[in-house]
Amino acid sequence: MQKVTFPNKILPYFLLAPQIVLTVVFFFWPASQAIYQSFMREDAFGLKSTFVELANFTAVLSDPNYLHSVQVTVVFNVLTALLAMGVALLLATAADRVIRGQTFYRTLLIWPYAVAPAVAGMLWLFMFNPAMGTFAYLLRRNGIAWDPLLDGNQAMGLVVVAAAWKQISYNFLFFVAGLQAIPKSLIEAAAIDGARGARRFWTIVFPLLAPTSFFLLVVNTVYAFFDTFGIIHAVTGGGPAKATETLVYKVYNDGFVNLNLGSSSAQSVILMAIVIALTAFQFRFVEKRVHYS
């Protein structure tokens, strides 16, 4: 591999400058403002802020509604990640076996990733809308009382399916790349030894996909935490009865709807700490178990 050298020593810093500026403006500055606001409390008119130390954090952590949103977030994250990764792996395995029209099938499978989260949510809401949705009509015809606007479990199921559908395409790309990187000689050797399709997959293919699966687990966790706001906002608005109010959506409700900036900032700081701790734990303790030589 040819080594690239820069004759001008300042050029690398100019190339890094746009990314550094974007990171500072859109991450470090908002994060610092959130940390600052989490220790403050505004008056009823928003004219004066008072330093209240850890009162906002204490109020948040003792709030039953916040603890409920933590439970909702855990359920939503686990179900979304499992469904999105499971279906993507199934589709990638099937697409890897297709010979004719392989490019066409793969292109169709990655199109949903280009759909905006809010649009994806509206698509699923229209299909399962209890008043005019096609699938809602089929469910009622089969004796299922379908109404996600009133039933919390049905609402959770709908947003999980919509969020997973949006992420399947992303996972599919990486699983296909991982499958293509597996030497065919290993699979052929296992077939010669008498291992059937399912056994070959679980003993040869799946362990070699562990690094890819770990990477996607981290990505899907972060996705479910932050990038599903548009879906929840479009489909359920956090309802019914806060059944789909995740941590991110509660930050929005408390900060932009109820205008409780101190509590909202404290929640965002806690959420940021949770994601950082969870990601660090995954890389520190899980990553060691997924690499094969």
UniProtKB/Swiss-Prot annotation:
Segments passing through the bilayer: 10-30, 72-92, 108-128, 155-177, 204-224, 261-281
Start and end residues of each ABC transmembrane type-1 domain: 66-282
CDD domains: TM_PBP2
Organism: Brucella suis biovar 1 (strain 1330)
Summary of subunit composition and partner proteins: The complex is composed of two ATP-binding proteins (UgpC), two transmembrane proteins (UgpA and UgpE) and a solute-binding protein (UgpB).
Protein name as it appears in the record: sn-glycerol-3-phosphate transport system permease protein UgpA
One cellular component term from this protein's GO annotations in UniProt: plasma membrane
Record function comment: Part of the ABC transporter complex UgpBAEC involved in sn-glycerol-3-phosphate (G3P) import. Probably responsible for the translocation of the substrate across the membrane.
UniProtKB keywords: Cell inner membrane, Cell membrane, Membrane, Transmembrane, Transmembrane helix, Transport
Main localization, broad class: membrane
UniProt-listed GO biological process terms: transmembrane transport
Similarity comment: Belongs to the binding-protein-dependent transport system permease family.
Subcellular location: Cell inner membrane
SUPFAM superfamilies documented for this protein: MetI-like
Membrane topology summary: Multi-pass membrane protein
Keyword flag Kinase: no
